[in-house]
């Protein structure tokens, strides 16, 4: 059953609860009338839980290899959430290209923040002193794609079997060691040989495997407020003059910032350009708790006050926002798959994770999407190994997990250390991003992260 992305308007949480209740009623009624069986009678090879970029890329890779798979998504469509953002893909480009068919890769430019500007073979991410405006470093990078999450998911969803309104409840494993049956809150189930959790940083599947305590992300003493905004043509031209796509700023007062484009609808009409920017700062968990119920107006006022210590483009970009402009605030967190108590039972290779579900990391070094897409490529190869009979399923999945945990777990720790150092002016130049740029690396010792959490 192939399906294109399901269009819908964003729904509030209460609407999702009502929708789930309606789904339960419909499935019970259909079962009574003999029109459906709540259990899928034909097992899929792979069930992917979560229609994010990782899960959809994995599904495309499996489909490309002729391996049956189903993607389930708890929301009622791809665009159910109102917030969109963009992500950097650089060293992970080859992995994404290997997963998708040529006709989709040929359209990758269409999901960039500026679809009108071809991606350069060689580019750089410039870091500025956000108070003085002086350049601090220029980080070289090859093929730096800035991809809009919503458009990327829409592209990757094409031709896939995606079933919406499927919120994970539990997973049951057959006694013969061959199957896993995944049950959903609407009363239906799907049986498969492998279940893959790609349901994001706050993964339900991860908590199913590890419990709500060990399976939750670890809160960090840092937070950020994000903005998307349009401006008048003159103001938009002014804000974009430093760099046409992206730049980073480090403020000696202890703030980190990013500024870039999110959507260039018409390159000749700056009033149609949407900018994407944020400021992050050190915030003890006690402070995060104390301000947990702040209104949008309070969050905006807070970040406007912080921006007064910045130079342009940040200062003007914040000053020009109306007082009722929507912002998104969040505390930073991570999940290290290599940490103590984070080792899950894959039940003989019948369940595993990829992407943020397996290794949620901070974003100031721009590694998350690259590791996630690399997971998808390596997991697709592992599935091909056992599906073709070249390896036992348990061995193939365990080998995938061993490599993924070493690679991405090391980056979780590196990225968290990097976040701490970028918010400490005395340590900025020793930070991983300043020392190593955006190239992948592994760091096996988790002790620095423990110290960061104690701050």
Model-assigned labels for residue ranges:
Residues 81-85, 290-294, 364-367:
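Short, solvent-exposed loop/turn segments at secondary-structure boundaries
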Residues 5-47, 108, 116-119, 124-133, ...:
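C-terminal helical "tail/cap" subdomain of flavin- and related membrane-associated enzymes
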Residues 157-322:
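Conserved FAD-binding catalytic core of PHBH/FMO-like flavoproteins
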Residues 74-78, 83-87, 92, 97:
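Glycine-rich active-site loop/strand segments that organize a redox cofactor
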Residues 16-17, 25, 29-46, 89-230, ...:
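Conserved N-terminal helical subregion
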Residues 54, 77, 202:
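Conserved Rossmann-like nucleotide-cofactor binding loop
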């Amino acid at each position: 059953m192939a399906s294109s992305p399901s269009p819908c308007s964003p729904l509030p949480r209460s609407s999702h609860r009502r929708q789930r209740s309606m789904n339960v009623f419909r499935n019970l009624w259909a079962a009574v009338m003999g029109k459906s069986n709540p259990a899928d009678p034909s097992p899929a090879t792979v069930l992917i839980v979560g229609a994010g970029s990782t899960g959809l890329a994995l599904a495309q890779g499996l489909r490309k290899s002729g391996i049956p798979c189903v993607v389930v998504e708890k929301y009622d469509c791809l665009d159910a959430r109102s917030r969109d953002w963009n992500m950097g893909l650089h060293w992970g480009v080859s992995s994404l290209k290997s997963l998708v068919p040529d006709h989709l890769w040929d359209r990758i430019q269409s999901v960039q923040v500026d679809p009108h500007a071809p991606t350069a073979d060689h580019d750089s991410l410039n870091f500025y002193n956000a108070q003085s405006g002086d350049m601090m470093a220029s980080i070289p990078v090859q093929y730096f794609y800035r991809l809009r999450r919503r458009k990327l998911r829409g592209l990757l969803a094409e031709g896939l079997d995606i079933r919406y309104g499927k919120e994970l409840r539990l997973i049951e494993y057959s006694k013969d060691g061959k199957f896993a049956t995944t049950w959903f809150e609407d009363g239906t189930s799907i049986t498969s040989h492998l279940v893959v959790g790609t349901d994001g940083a706050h993964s339900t599947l991860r908590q199913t495997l590890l419990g709500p305590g060990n399976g939750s992300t670890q809160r960090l003493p840092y937070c950020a407020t994000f903005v998307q905004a349009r401006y008048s043509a003159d103001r938009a031209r002014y804000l974009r003059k430093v760099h046409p796509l992206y730049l980073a700023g480090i403020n000696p007062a202890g703030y980190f910032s990013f500024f870039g484009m999110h959507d260039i609808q018409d390159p000749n009409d700056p009033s149609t350009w949407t900018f994407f920017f944020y400021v992050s700062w050190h915030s003890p968990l006690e402070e995060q708790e104390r301000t947990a119920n702040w209104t949008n107006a309070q969050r905006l006022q807070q970040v406007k006050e912080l921006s007064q210590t910045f130079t342009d483009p940040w200062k003007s970009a914040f000053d020009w926002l109306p007082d009722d402009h929507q912002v998104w605030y969040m505390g930073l967190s991570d999940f290290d798959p290599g940490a103590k108590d984070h080792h899950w039972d894959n039940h003989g290779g019948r369940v595993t994770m990829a992407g943020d579900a397996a290794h949620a990391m901070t974003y100031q070094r721009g590694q998350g999407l690259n590791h996630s897409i690399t997971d998808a490529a390596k997991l697709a190869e592992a599935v091909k190994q056992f599906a073709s009979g070249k390896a036992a399923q348990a061995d193939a999945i365990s080998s995938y997990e061993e490599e993924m945990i070493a690679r991405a777990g090391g980056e979780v720790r590196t990225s968290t250390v990097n976040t701490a150092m970028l918010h400490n002016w005395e340590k900025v130049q020793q930070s991983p991003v300043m020392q190593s740029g955006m190239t992948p690396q592994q760091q096996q010792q988790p002790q620095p992260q423990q110290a960061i959490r104690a701050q």
